[in-house]
Swiss-Prot record:
Gene Ontology CC entries for this record: outer membrane-bounded periplasmic space; plasma membrane protein complex
Predominant location category: membrane
GO MF annotations in UniProt: energy transducer activity
Keywords, sorted A to Z: Cell inner membrane, Cell membrane, Membrane, Protein transport, Transmembrane, Transmembrane helix, Transport
Annotated TM spans: 52-69
Originating species: Pseudomonas aeruginosa (strain ATCC 15692 / DSM 22644 / CIP 104116 / JCM 14847 / LMG 12228 / 1C / PRS 101 / PAO1)
Biased composition (Pro residues): 94-118, 144-180
Disordered: region residues: 80-187
Taxonomic lineage: Bacteria, Pseudomonadati, Pseudomonadota, Gammaproteobacteria, Pseudomonadales
Protein name in UniProt: Protein tonB2
UniProt membrane topology term: Single-pass membrane protein
GO biological process: protein transport; siderophore transport; transmembrane transport
Residues exposed to the Cytoplasmic side: 1-51
């Protein structure tokens, strides 16, 4: 059985229908193809008036959008509360007095002994002294009668000698050096003063110099503002804190005594 070959409409203008009739298809198809090839579909061209209207409409639309965006309120930024930096309170302890050592005792002067004289055996010896002639004996005088001895008066008694003055008392021993009291926040665990809220908000800073009377037990009994910081709030905060402090009392030797100490307190905001 032969395989049917495809038929081109351009080469085969006739087609056999199932009923056996022949239909001429070549001419109508060729005319349609000719029209499509020589008359392609053309798009509709806008007129000048329509173009101007479209441009005006686009500009109006863009202007409305820009106006609407400009009327929108910018959202307010969130308020950030001011942050207070950490507070640094410095404590400066007064320098301890320098105890000068006693000067050394002067050494006794060394007395140099004169060297012994050197005897020169070869030196010329002096001539021996001449013998002294013996004196001639004088005639003995004749004894004369002696007068009677007078009575010897007794000597007056000697005045009593004054008693020797008593020996001066031995000088008292030198007193032991006095060590002033001190406040060391490092090992005494003294709490730092609280920074007043008003001074913190207004940025007040200053140094308060306190004069503290320390008992032998180490507790403060009296606090005086020796030099103010210029802010009453800072002065009161310093006095309030030092009332709770513990001090190293003054000592004379190994014995604790009452004493005064100066305590500077610095209030600084970093």
């Amino acid at each position: 059985m032969a395989t049917p070959q495809p038929v081109d409409a351009r080469t085969q203008p006739w087609r056999e229908t199932p009923g056996g009739d022949l239909v001429a298809l070549g001419r109508p198809v060729r005319q349609a193809l000719h029209l499509v090839r020589h008359n392609p579909a053309q798009g509709r061209v806008l007129s000048r008036r329509e173009t101007i209207l479209l441009v005006l409409f686009a500009l109006t639309l863009h202007g409305a959008v820009i106006h609407w965006l400009s009327q929108q309120r910018t959202p307010a930024l969130p308020e950030v509360p001011p942050q207070v930096p950490p507070m640094t309170i410095e404590f400066t302890a007064p320098a301890p007095p320098v105890v000068e050592p006693p000067p050394p005792e002067p050494l006794p002067p060394v007395v140099e002994e004169p060297p012994p004289p050197v005897v020169d055996e070869n030196a010329v010896k002096p001539p021996p002294p001449k013998p002294v002639p013996k004196p001639k004996p004088k005639p003995k005088p004749q004894p004369r009668p002696k007068p009677a001895p007078k009575a010897v008066e007794p000597a007056p008694p000697a005045p009593p000698q004054p008693a020797a003055p008593p020996a001066p008392p031995a000088p008292a021993a030198a007193p032991a050096p006095l060590t002033p009291p001190s406040a060391n926040a490092g090992y005494l665990h003294n709490p730092a003063p609280e920074y007043p809220a008003l001074a913190m908000r207004r940025g007040w800073e200053g140094t308060v110099l306190l004069r503290v009377h320390v008992l032998a037990s180490g507790s403060p009994s009296e606090i005086q503002v020796q030099k103010s910081s210029g802010r009453e709030a800072l002065d009161q905060a310093a006095v309030k804190a030092v009332k709770r402090w513990s001090f190293v009392p003054a000592k004379r030797g190994d014995k604790a005594e009452d004493g005064w100490v100066s305590v500077p307190i610095d209030f600084k905001l970093n």
